[in-house]
Amino acid sequence: MARTKQTARKSTGAKAPRKQLASKAARKSAPATGGIKKPHR
């Protein structure tokens, strides 16, 4: 379940990078995105 959720989230973010999705993705993998520093702080 966790793997599916992560994959789905990453897939959605890559397909349609939205502000909300990007924020959630950045929070889970801030180093991977390395783009938004606000959610991490």
From Swiss-Prot:
Q: Does the keyword DNA-binding apply?
A: yes
Q: Which UniProt keywords apply?
A: Chromosome, DNA-binding, Nucleosome core, Nucleus
Q: How is this protein annotated for GO cellular component?
A: nucleosome; nucleus
SUPFAM superfamilies given in the database record: Histone-fold
> Which InterPro entries would you find in this protein's record?
Histone-fold (IPR009072), Histone_H3/CENP-A (IPR000164)
Q: Name one GO molecular function term.
A: protein heterodimerization activity
Give the record's family classification: Belongs to the histone H3 family.
- Reported function: Core component of nucleosome. Nucleosomes wrap and compact DNA into chromatin, limiting DNA accessibility to the cellular machineries which require DNA as a template. Histones thereby play a central role in transcription regulation, DNA repair, DNA replication and chromosomal stability. DNA accessibility is regulated via a complex set of post-translational modifications of histones, also called histone code, and nucleosome remodeling.
Annotated protein name in UniProt:
Histone H3.2
Q: Which organism is it from?
A: Tetrahymena americanis
Taxon lineage: Eukaryota, Sar, Alveolata, Ciliophora, Intramacronucleata
